[in-house]
Design a protein with these regions (language model features):
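Conserved, mostly hydrophobic/aromatic
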Residues: 17, 45, 88, 108, ...
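Terminal RNA-binding accessory module
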Residues: 131-225
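Radical SAM enzyme [4Fe-4S]-AdoMet core and its adjacent flexible, acidic
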Residues: 1-7, 11, 57-61, 123-154
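Conserved SAM/AdoMet-binding glycine-rich loop
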Residues: 1-98
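Flexible glycine/acidic-rich beta-alpha junction loops that bind and position SAM and/or redox cofactors
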Residues: 24-28, 47-59, 91-98, 115-140, ...
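A glycine- and small/hydrophobic-rich beta-loop-beta segment
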Residues: 87-89, 101-111, 118
């Protein structure tokens, strides 16, 4: 309801939701959100692990299968080619076996996230997990973090490559020079574009180009989309 009210405000061109737990989105919610044209088709859907056993240990209120079902509903509602998902993943949670990690790695790769924040589990006093048995050695947590990071970056590059040649609208954010800007598409793809005559805050039409490992190089289009 708040999103719908915000979309009705004149001058607001883009609405982007922050981090969401998958159990927060009902089918009705997804249908209503998909009808809001100003809502960016990008969702940061918190995952934490792609292994249901690990999710139970984390006391998350969903399984990997339930997460995948919500992601599929979002893709169906917004269009698979139009929607992008981002998430957070923890590796090395107490009790996570190599098999559990591999399962999480496969799940995360299959979801084709545009961006994944990967964190090694950090043991903190006062939390339930602090006293859990089978704590993972630091060197193993670091190794799993590297492996997960390499996998998600490969997927990120592949997803970005799939957007090459597409026309999109970019919100210009940080100026790198008087004419060169970084910015984001509605799908939260980071881009860099030469946009003489424009300034931060402008929304400009571009053609998505090559991915450089951090951003997509984009070319400014003369006409509005």
């Amino acid at each position: 309801e708040l999103v719908e009210h915000a979309a009705a405000v004149e001058g607001i061109e883009r609405i982007r939701l922050g981090s969401l737990d998958p159990d927060m989105l009902s089918e009705s919610d997804i249908r209503r959100l998909a009808a809001v044209k100003k809502l960016c088709p990008q969702f940061h859907l918190s995952l934490q692990s792609g292994c249901s056993k690990t999710l139970r240990a984390m006391r998350r209120p969903y399984t990997a299968e339930q997460y995948a079902a919500i992601a599929a509903r979002l893709r169906e509602a917004f269009g698979d080619e139009n929607l992008s998902l981002t998430t957070d993943v923890i590796v090395g949670f107490p009790g996570e076996t190599e098999e559990d990690f591999e399962q999480s790695l496969r799940f995360v790769s299959a979801q084709r996230f545009l961006k994944v924040h990967v964190f090694p589990y950090s043991r903190r006093k006062g939390t339930a997990a602090y006293d859990f048995p089978d704590q993972i050695p630091e060197h193993e947590k670091e190794a799993r973090s590297r492996r997960m990071g390499e996998a998600v970056e490969a997927v990120r590059a592949d997803v970005a490559a799939g957007m090459r040649g597409m026309h999109a609208e970019v919100l210009l954010e940080t100026p790198l020079s008087s004419t060169l800007f970084t910015g984001y598409t509605r799908q939260y793809l980071p881009v860099v574009v030469q946009a003489p005559g424009h300034q931060s805050g402008d929304i400009v039409p571009v053609c998505i180009g090559e991915w450089d490992g951090q951003r997509a190089k984009a070319a400014l289009l003369a006409a509005s989309l």
